[in-house]
Amino acid sequence: MGGKRLVVIGGTAAGLSAASKAKRLDGSLEVTVFERGGYVSYGSCGLPYFVGGMIREADDLVSLTAEELRSKRGFRVHTHTEVVRIDRARKLVEAKDLENGGTFDAPYDALVIATGSRPIIPPIVGMESRGVFTVRSVEDGIAIRDRAGKARAACVIGGGVIGLEMAEQLALRGLKVTIFEALDRLLPAFPEEHSRLVA
């Protein structure tokens, strides 16, 4: 029998940071990572710069690939796999392979849930239409970049940091960009004097 088993749900920056720290503290730890998307070990803050072309390839957003996490850190990494149930009494998770539909269980001694943030989607008619995107995953960035290559104009809903970075990068690609912010100023989470600098 090996060491204790750590299951991490979410293979982006926070989840892998926790997994790496735990593995450094206990080298015998068996680490299993589940990621719903196809990419691991990336920070979503780079997505606007990928859309704008400053970061040329999607793989350049990634610090370590799933294969590198396996070979260099000894992690078991399941991409395109979603954890659909946590059985706390039996200390196992049920995972679904999103490519073939199969399910399997993974036992754990410790569990980290690092599924990241969710975009706030305003109740606007048409938000589920083609050409409407959120900015969360590498796959989102690829879809936005592909669409931006065929577009002349873009609307960005949200005047926070990510929204402004995305608006800037789309404008640098030559798109006419309109920003919509529900509150009375851009960068509403920052002090008002910062908002005035970008208005």
Predicted region positions:
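Conserved phosphate-binding and hydrolysis motifs of nucleotide-dependent enzymes
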Residues: 10-15, 116, 158-163
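Beta1-alpha1 glycine-rich phosphate/pyrophosphate-binding loop at the start
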Residues: 2-78, 169-193
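FAD-binding core/adjacent interface of flavoenzyme oxidoreductases
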Residues: 1-9, 62, 67-155
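Short glycine-/acidic-enriched loop or helix-start segments at secondary-structure transitions
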Residues: 18-19, 43, 88, 122-124, ...
